[in-house]
């Protein structure tokens, strides 16, 4: 796959001159695509290089990707109890804040869960748009298959909404400034924009290095997300960090001038910390017995194996709770994906949890259904391989 170097800072729009490389993986699995054939899987590898712009301090991917990849992209991380609980909480927040007559646009609606949930609770003026296959299959549920704003139906192209929602989309956008401007332009007078993105500071504080991957072009802190919103004439009126994907920002914006904001600090120590993480994974690969399997096949599993390719070679396969992934391969590897129930029929000698943000939920089920003497490790965790019963 041919990559084009990014030429501008995605926050300031200025030329990306003299950016500092935070880290680089020369050959990394490409997350979020699940091929049916191993030959196709092995082609899905690209470089991964993350830089920090010197003038603005913004952290971003150093390359440009073809947006057509998103037609193949499958978000695989939404099956946990914690994530579903967060979606319910998000919907409840909307119900508390807005009247049922509120006009709502969700940009990046995925399979339309939130649109359907809000309709079930009495909201009637709803529209979702997403380029994924899931949106195409749900067209009858007020979902549009395509890219915002160009693929909105003519009847909605210049429409204004009381609430615009975009969850875990902005980090994927190659040119976020015009995208943010389009979100702001879709707001009715007095309307609100609710944004949710992975939180860079949570990633750094918790050493969640697999939050960096090729289809995340942009890495926002609360500061830089507010700066991006300010380029579109928006100011933040409320914000929090929510406990999904290791910590995500949920911030709410209205039209208005934002206060002056400082330049983010330099992140000089990241490269050394990532080298230590890679060394930890390499040691783990040498420790696991033959027949070891992994649990969790979402995007972060693929990039974790990019940090330590020998760990991929030490695994016999992966299990995942998303039944739609069964029978496919983790991109960039030879690792087949099996459904969760298959795990309980032929228990491997050792299991490594890659879905670390859901580790507690996974372990709760394993305590009931798997032998207590089976070896378990949490990839990137702070404890070594140990029997399952030791995790109580």
What does each of the following model-derived ranges do?
Residues 165:
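A conserved beta-strand element that flanks and buttresses the S-adenosyl-L-methionine
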Residues 93-94, 250-392:
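Hydrophobic, well-ordered beta-alpha structural blocks that scaffold small-molecule cofactor pockets
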Residues 177-192:
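A short glycine-rich, Lys/Arg-flanked "PGG" loop and its adjoining helix->strand segment in the class I
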Residues 43-134, 208, 213, 218, ...:
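Extended interfacial segments that mediate partner engagement and assembly in macromolecular machines
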Residues 2-82, 240, 252:
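N-terminal juxtadomain amphipathic helix
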Residues 190-198, 375-378:
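Conserved beta-strand signature within the Rossmann-like core of class I S-adenosyl-L-methionine
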Residues 27, 195-218, 222-224, 228:
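Short, glycine-/aromatic-enriched active-site segment of Class I SAM-dependent methyltransferases
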Residues 140-153:
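Conserved SAM-binding strand-loop segment of SAM-dependent methyltransferases
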């Amino acid at each position: 796959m041919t990559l084009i170097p990014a030429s501008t800072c995605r926050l300031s729009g200025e030329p990306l001159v003299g950016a500092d490389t935070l880290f680089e993986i020369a050959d990394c699995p490409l997350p979020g695509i699940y091929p049916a054939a191993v030959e196709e899987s092995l082609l899905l590898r690209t470089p991964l290089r993350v830089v920090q712009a010197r003038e603005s301090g913004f952290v971003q991917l150093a390359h440009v990707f073809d947006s057509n990849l998103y037609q193949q992209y499958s978000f695989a991380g939404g099956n946990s109890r914690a994530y579903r609980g967060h979606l319910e909480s998000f919907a409840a927040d909307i119900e508390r804040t807005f009247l049922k007559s509120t006009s709502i646009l969700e940009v990046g609606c995925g399979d339309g869960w939130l649109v359907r949930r809000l309709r079930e609770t009495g909201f009637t003026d709803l529209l979702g748009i997403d380029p994924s296959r899931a949106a195409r299959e749900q067209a009858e549920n007020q979902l549009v298959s395509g890219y915002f704003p160009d693929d909105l139906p003519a009847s909605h192209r210049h429409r204004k909404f009381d609430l615009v929602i975009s969850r875990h989309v902005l980090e994927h956008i190659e040119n976020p400034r015009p995208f943010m401007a389009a979100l702001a332009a879709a707001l009715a007078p007095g309307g609100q924009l609710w944004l949710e993105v992975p939180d860079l500071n949570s990633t750094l504080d918790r050493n969640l290095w697999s939050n960096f991957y090729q289809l995340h072009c942009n890495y926002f802190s609360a500061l830089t997300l507010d700066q991006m919103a300010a380029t579109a004439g928006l100011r933040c009126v409320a914000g929090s960090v929510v406990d999904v994907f290791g910590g995500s920002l949920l911030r709410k914006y209205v039209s208005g001038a934002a206060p002056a904001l400082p330049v983010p600090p330099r992140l000089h120590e990241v490269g050394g910390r990532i080298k230590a993480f890679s060394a930890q994974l390499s040691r783990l690969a040498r420790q696991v017995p033959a027949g070891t399997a992994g649990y969790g096949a979402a995007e972060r599993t693929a990039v974790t194996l990019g940090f330590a390719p020998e760990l991929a070679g030490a695994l016999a396969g992966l299990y995942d709770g998303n039944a739609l992934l069964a029978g496919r391969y983790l991109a960039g590897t030879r690792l087949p994906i099996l459904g969760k129930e298959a795990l309980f029929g032929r228990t491997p000698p050792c299991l490594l949890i890659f879905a670390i943000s859901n580790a507690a939920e996974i372990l709760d089920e394993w305590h009931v259904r798997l032998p207590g003497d089976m070896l378990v490790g949490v990839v990137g965790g702070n404890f070594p391989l140990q029997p399952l019963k030791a995790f109580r």
